[in-house]
Amino acid sequence: MDAVQVVGDGQMECTRVGVLVGGGSLGFGDEAMPMKVMRAKDLDVMVCGEITEWTLCAYVNDASQLGKRRAMIVIGHERTEEWGMKHMATWLAPLVPGVPVSFLNAKEPFWYV
């Protein structure tokens, strides 16, 4: 992502961080799942790929207004999966000798104004 989105207090002290890559932060059919994980694991910050803005942003903003340490960093779907896909190419190549394996950067699909 050519920009990083942040919700919550960017200056707060952070002790616990969770990561949901790609579409995992959409909740796998349960859009409340990221909030449930933040509460259950007592996470200060959730680093996300892609989000449902009307739920996760509202939760983080509401929690911050109530004095809880909560923030979210949204990096983008492709960018959060990129690290794993680079590793996948390295991991897969020895398993398929003779077959060319390489990482192709999907790049940021959006352009910004």
Please annotate each region the language model reported.
Residues M1-V113:
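Active-site catalytic microenvironments in core metabolic enzymes, especially phosphate/sugar-handling
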